C-alpha cells in the first residue's frame, strides 16, 4: 500500500494541507480528517476489532470495526470501503452516515494524541473476512447490546472514540437499525 497522508484541518474544518500519516500522530497531533466505521454481518452482529500491537496509537485496544483517513480527492465513504478491504479483506454495502459531526481529541497512555474530525459510518459486510494481521490482532462478532453494556460498564476497555460514539444517543439509535436482519 502506498504511503498514506492525513488531511490537515483548521478549527473550522477547512483543509489546510497534508502530512504523512505516521508523522502526523505525535504528542502534538494537528486537527485532521478521519472516519470511523461500524460493520455488521447478515446476523446483525457487530464486528469489534483489537488493534495490532504495531499500531502507533492505542496498540492492542479493542475498538469498532475499522477507522482511517480519507486521502486527497477521496470521499469518506470511498475511504471506508478502501480501509475495509485493506484491514479486513471484506466487501461492504455502501456506508451510511450515523454520526456525521463527530469530533474528538484523546491521548493514549504513551502520549500519542488523536485529534480528529471523524464522521462515523455503518455498513453491512457482504463477504468473508480476511484479516490483515498488521492492522488487526483479534476480532469478535458480538451482539450490539452486549457491546454497549460493556462500554457502559468498562469504558476503559475500549478505544476512546468508540466509547464517545457509542454513548451518543442518536448514533446508538442508528446503529441499532443495523442489528435488524435484512
Curated annotation (Swiss-Prot):
Keywords in alphabetical order: Cytoplasm, Isomerase, Isoprene biosynthesis, Magnesium, Manganese, Metal-binding
Cofactor: record remark: Binds 1 Mg(2+) ion per subunit. The magnesium ion binds only when substrate is bound.
Root EC class: isomerase
Sequence positions that bind Mg(2+): 67, 87
Family membership noted in the UniProt record: Belongs to the IPP isomerase type 1 family.
NCBIfam families: IPP_isom_1, PRK03759.1
Protein name, UniProt field: Isopentenyl-diphosphate Delta-isomerase
Underlying gene: idi
Amino acid at each position: 500500500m502506498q504511503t498514506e497522508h492525513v488531511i490537515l484541518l483548521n478549527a473550522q474544518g477547512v483543509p489546510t494541507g497534508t502530512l504523512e500519516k505516521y508523522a502526523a500522530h505525535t504528542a502534538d497531533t494537528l486537527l485532521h480528517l478521519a472516519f470511523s466505521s461500524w460493520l455488521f454481518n447478515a446476523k446483525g452482529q457487530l464486528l469489534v476489532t483489537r488493534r495490532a500491537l504495531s499500531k502507533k496509537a492505542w496498540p492492542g485496544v479493542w475498538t469498532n470495526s475499522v477507522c482511517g483517513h480519507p486521502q486527497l480527492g477521496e470521499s469518506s465513504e470511498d475511504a471506508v470501503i478502501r480501509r475495509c478491504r485493506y484491514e479486513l479483506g471484506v466487501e461492504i454495502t455502501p456506508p451510511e452516515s450515523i454520526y456525521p459531526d463527530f469530533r474528538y481529541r484523546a491521548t493514549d497512555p504513551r502520549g500519542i494524541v488523536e485529534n480528529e474530525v471523524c464522521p462515523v459510518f455503518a455498513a453491512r459486510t457482504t463477504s468473508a473476512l480476511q484479516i490483515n494481521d498488521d492492522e488487526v490482532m483479534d476480532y469478535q462478532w458480538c451482539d450490539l447490546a452486549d457491546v454497549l453494556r460493556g462500554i457502559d460498564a468498562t469504558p476503559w476497555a475500549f478505544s476512546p472514540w468508540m466509547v464517545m460514539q457509542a454513548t451518543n444517543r442518536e448514533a446508538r439509535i442508528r446503529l441499532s437499525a443495523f442489528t435488524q436482519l435484512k
